[in-house]
């Protein structure tokens, strides 16, 4: 469902004694539809590049994005594992250096850990479910699908006839 975002309204231009009333509010629905579609297209485009084992991470991220769809926000990575999965970096307990941390224990990047750890710096993604899985998957999706996104936005916003 599109958000209640207002892009344009009514305004007046006065120049040299001439007053022009302009009402662009009729475009709001088109732009809301375009934004809603773009947000959905971005999320859908990212999925093949996201790491997936059980599917929970992808599903949680998709649900979080769906909850804000139409606002111009898309979650590329949601939940506690999101940051390190998106950046492709291993995080360890700041206390023990283990990849497992106790409840409430802060996790840091391997490069920020002051002690010794056997953890590797970079994540290695399982590519069984998603062969194109990689870090920074929004960028990969954007590189592949930006032209499709623009075409759909133009179409939904009412300007798609000219390309």
Give each language-model segment a name.
Residues 2-13, 33, 47, 54-163:
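Charged, low-complexity interaction tracts
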Residues 13-16, 20:
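Small-xxx-small helix-packing motif
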Residues 22-23, 129:
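General secondary-structure edge motif
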Residues 23-54:
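Charged, well-structured alpha/beta interaction segments
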């Amino acid at each position: 469902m599109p958000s209640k975002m207002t892009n344009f309204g009514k305004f007046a231009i006065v120049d040299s004694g001439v007053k022009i009333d302009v009402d662009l509010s009729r475009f709001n629905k088109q732009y809301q539809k375009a934004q809603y579609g773009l947000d959905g297209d971005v999320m859908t485009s990212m999925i093949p590049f996201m790491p997936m084992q059980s599917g929970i991470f992808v599903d949680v991220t998709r649900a979080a994005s769906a909850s804000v769809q139409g606002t111009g926000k898309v979650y590329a990575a949601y939940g506690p594992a999101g940051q390190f999965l998106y950046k492709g970096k291993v995080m360890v307990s700041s206390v023990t250096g283990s990849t497992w941390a106790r409840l409430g224990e802060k996790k840091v990047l391997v490069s920020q850990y002051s002690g010794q750890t056997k953890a590797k710096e970079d994540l290695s993604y399982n590519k069984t479910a998603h062969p194109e899985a990689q870090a920074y998957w929004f960028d990969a999706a954007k590189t592949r699908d930006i032209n499709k996104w623009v075409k759909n936005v133009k179409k939904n916003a009412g300007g798609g006839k000219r390309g």
